[in-house]
Amino acid sequence: MKNKYYPLRSSMDELSTKNDNEIDLEKGPLPEYNSEDGNTLPPYSENINLKDPKQMGQNITKLFNWNKSTTPPDYDENRLPITDEGNNPPNTHRENHSSGTADNSSPFLIKLIISFTPIFVLNVPAVCYLTYKDALFKDYGKDEWVYFGVWCAICLMSFISLWCFYETWTKAVKVTVIFLAQCVKVTVIFLAQCVKVTAIFSAQCIKVTVISLAKCVKVIAVGLYNSKKDLVVTIWLAWVVICFILFGCVKDGRLNLNKALICSTSSISAALFFILLLVCIPIWTLKHMLFGLFQVLGVQSCVVIVTKGLMYLFDKHIDATGYEIEASSLFVIGNFLFFYEMERPGALKRMPKFIRNGIASFLGGIANAFGGIANAIRGANDNNDIPLGEMEVESEV
């Protein structure tokens, strides 16, 4: 369906165009008036004589010939809806103010309350403080009453100023509050965006770091496995798990072991892991590593038992410094013995024999020293046993 637009022009519009007369849409066109003819009424006499507004509206409608039948045939009614309630024309009523401007002034009571509110808020803390100190209107002298009067005068002048310039300062406060609210809003949005960006960046950094570490561990594990290091990584992981279990049991109180011993054993695993990262260890078999670890633990246990026995024998207790010294000693001894055993297999097995030979050599040296002292004493005694006659003969010769 083609929509054609026809201008809404009535016969009255054409008449006004011809006569160059302006028509008041509210009152309608001016009918012809003939003063000589008594039958002709003056303009708008019908509306003046009618007291009912509805009848006036009907007369105006008749003057305009307002009816839907005047609509062009091809005009779409949806474009300009026309109400037909009592054949009334569209509402063309315009509000007219007698003064011409809207009254924006606030009521007197509201101005009074709002102007007094700042003074009240300013004085409430002072009154509360003086009441708390029990100094409100108590033991006031001349100076105190003068100060009180000056303060009341200041408050009164402030109240009068606020009341007189109510419109100005309320607008200023309103603008300031809106500005501060916008600043807070912008700041909150900016901080939220910063937090969001920081969180996303941190998450990406953590993700990249975890992926990189996983790749490094994978590369190291594959490299160690391909380099025929028999179960080295597996042994280290198992050893770390054992150390964590021991630490957890000691901390929980379900296992009573020497903390220094546990520290030393865990230090071995840490040193082993460091060397594994460098990939500079020889080919250690599972049997060799287990024997080395257990032998080191045995030596450390012997050291701990001897230390505890001596402390118990002399009725001494090890304080925190003593435990630190013991842990440091076991750390050095444990790592030295472990790596010495790894580099020289069987060194710990030969150690008792070496210690025994050393002790035997030391005791043999002591025995030889005592033998030399005995021989010297014996030689001195032999010189004292020479006969007196032989000594005289020798003197004569």
UniProtKB/Swiss-Prot annotation:
Residues 11-29 have a biased composition (Basic and acidic residues). Keywords: Cytoplasm, Endoplasmic reticulum, Membrane, Toxin, Transmembrane, Transmembrane helix, Vacuole. The keyword Membrane applies. The keyword Endoplasmic reticulum applies. The chain crosses the membrane at residues 108-128, 145-165, 175-195, 205-225, 230-250, 266-286, 290-310, 320-340, 357-377. Signal peptide: none annotated. It comes from the Eukaryota. Belongs to the WTF family. Promotes unequal transmission of alleles from the parental zygote to progeny spores by acting as poison/antidote system where the poison and antidote proteins are produced from the same locus; the poison component is trans-acting and targets all spores within an ascus whereas the antidote component is spore-specific, leading to poisoning of all progeny that do not inherit the allele. Homomer. Forms protein aggregates. The two isoforms can interact with each other and with themselves. High sequence similarity is required for their interaction. This is Meiotic driver wtf28. It comes from Schizosaccharomyces kambucha.
